Amino acid sequence: MGRAVCLCSGGLDSTVAATIARRSGMDVYLIHVSYGQQAERREIEAIERIADAIGASDLMCSRIDLFRNISALTTQGARIPRGEEVSLDSESTPPTWVYCRNTVLLSMAAAYAEYLGAHSIYVGFNAEEAMSYPDNRPEFVEQFNALLEKAVASFSRPPKVVAPLVDMRKKDIVRLGADIKAPLELTWSCYLNGEIHCGTCESCQHRRRGFVEAGIPDPTEYQH
């Protein structure tokens, strides 16, 4: 089936996407990028366990400083909206938005894919987060794939971004992950760097609601 690069944060969505690629018979090459996110340590711990669990062929952990201190998400000690400050179904862009993050990270994944001769780049973009994050939307994927047609060497077959969850809400992703035996219990969703999920940041609230609405027991330990 060939090779697939999977851009994976160690979170729920990207782990399910990577598991889909692996279950389809592809050799999976995970790439994680540290860009200054407060939860960097916990993400790396999660992605290392996930790589082993799904049988990834390799895990590349990369680092860039471009995004440091330009978002609440990437400023150490910055206040991240929590609890009732979070509106899960809002269409407004939250302070955790990181400017052009997915454009940059996908470019890195595309370079890795071209080097490997991988024809697919799997991502965990989904309908729930697309409401407030424009670089999670189907039209973004479509336009980025059009860019890749022009961006690779003439002798290369352009890799294509594959977003298998792009029309799904979190509850659907949880159900699918359970069905394909993705290691959901190993994933890290929290924006913070604690020993357990805080339970109150936007990402924790999406995660918790997804398990509740899916009717599947949540393996996550939350602080609140």
Swiss-Prot record:
One of its GO terms (molecular function) is ATP binding. Pathway: Purine metabolism; 7-cyano-7-deazaguanine biosynthesis. Its EC number is 6.3.4.20. It is an enzyme of class 6 (ligase). ATP binds at residues 8-18. Pfam families: QueC (PF06508). The keyword Metal-binding applies. Binds 1 zinc ion per subunit. Coiled coil: none annotated. It catalyses: 7-carboxy-7-deazaguanine + NH4(+) + ATP = 7-cyano-7-deazaguanine + ADP + phosphate + H2O + H(+). Its cofactor is Zn(2+). Zn(2+) binds at residues 190, 198, 201, 204. The keyword Nucleotide-binding applies. Keywords: ATP-binding, Ligase, Metal-binding, Nucleotide-binding, Zinc. Catalyzes the ATP-dependent conversion of 7-carboxy-7-deazaguanine (CDG) to 7-cyano-7-deazaguanine (preQ(0)). HAMAP family: QueC. Belongs to the QueC family. PANTHER family: 7-CYANO-7-DEAZAGUANINE SYNTHASE. This is 7-cyano-7-deazaguanine synthase. It comes from Methanothrix thermoacetophila (strain DSM 6194 / JCM 14653 / NBRC 101360 / PT) (Methanosaeta thermophila).
